[in-house]
């Protein structure tokens, strides 16, 4: 009877192991050399895209308020902030009594007005406590309240008289104003300030800029024109990582001087990547 010796099991020799480790090391080093720049580039592009998106969102949010603002209500203490009075809507009011149907409610500039008919379909509707503004020729008027009055009631008049009837605290409409237009301002926000706070090119340990862009609302109407940017405690934050801001406003752009021009610039920095956007728009200053 023959006995067969078990087959010898063969493994890695020390030389083979060393060669394998060396080859894997070379492959790993090669992958790092070629892949790391590609990965870093992808991460940088993603960061810049996010910065551009955040900057665009913040600028368009400001521009939406600028375009909807009460005419001539923009005030700029400096290039780091600006104030305005955004509206919720507006329309045309009745300027004379209906000569056929009795019971209309015109706004008579000769006496104080407490109610008037509205020809336009207001969407959305203002609420009791919101503010009616008429003929804002000067920036200080809407803030001081000379052409602004609180809404006390809303009603639907006869169809021949208009779409809506607004009751307001007694207000004498400006003499000589023939536009027949009004705007209304939500009492929930009143005047609004946009401000850059803490913007600086000095970055923190993560490569982020320290500034923030904020929207401050519902602080009331200040008759005195601001000379500096306000404190931003409790304000809504629109953007972080702000490196710099620059807000410029020309109230009398063009030959007719009926429209202004606003330029909004913001620069954001995060993870040592920077995106800078500029947006400009014409501003209607015709009440």
Q: What is each of the regions a protein language model found here?
A:
Residues 1-12:
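N-terminal leader/signal peptides at the extreme start of proteins
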Residues 12-67:
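Aliphatic-rich helix starts adjacent to a transmembrane/signal segment
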């Amino acid at each position: 009877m023959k006995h067969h010796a078990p087959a010898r099991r063969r493994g890695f020799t020390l030389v083979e192991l060393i060669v394998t480790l060396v080859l894997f090391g070379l492959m790993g080093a090669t992958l790092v050399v070629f892949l790391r720049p590609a990965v870093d580039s992808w991460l940088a592009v993603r960061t810049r895209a996010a910065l551009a998106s955040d900057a665009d969102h913040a600028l368009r949010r400001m521009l939406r308020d600028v375009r909807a603002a009460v005419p001539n209500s923009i005030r700029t203490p400096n290039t780091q902030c600006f104030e305005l009075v955004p509206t919720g809507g507006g329309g045309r009011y009745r300027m004379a009594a209906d000569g056929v149907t009795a019971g209309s409610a015109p706004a008579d500039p000769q006496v104080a007005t407490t109610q008037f008919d509205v020809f336009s379909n207001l969407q959305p509707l203002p609420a009791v406590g919101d503010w009616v503004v008429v003929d804002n020729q000067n920036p200080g008027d809407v803030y001081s309240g000379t052409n602004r009055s609180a809404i006390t009631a809303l009603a639907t008049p006869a169809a021949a008289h208009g779409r809506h009837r607004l009751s307001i605290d007694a207000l004498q409409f400006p003499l000589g104003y023939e536009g027949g237009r009004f705007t209304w301002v939500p009492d929930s926000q009143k005047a609004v300030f946009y401000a850059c706070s803490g913007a600086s090119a000095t970055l923190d340990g993560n490569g982020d800029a320290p500034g923030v862009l904020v929207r401050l609302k519902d602080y009331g109407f200040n008759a005195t024109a601001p000379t500096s940017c306000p404190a931003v405690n409790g304000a809504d934050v629109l953007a972080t990582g702000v490196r710099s801001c620059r807000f410029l406003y020309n109230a009398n752009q063009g030959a007719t001087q009926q429209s202004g021009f606003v330029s909004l610039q913001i620069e954001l920095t995060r993870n040592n990547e920077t995106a800078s956007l500029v947006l400009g728009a014409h501003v209607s200053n015709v009440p």
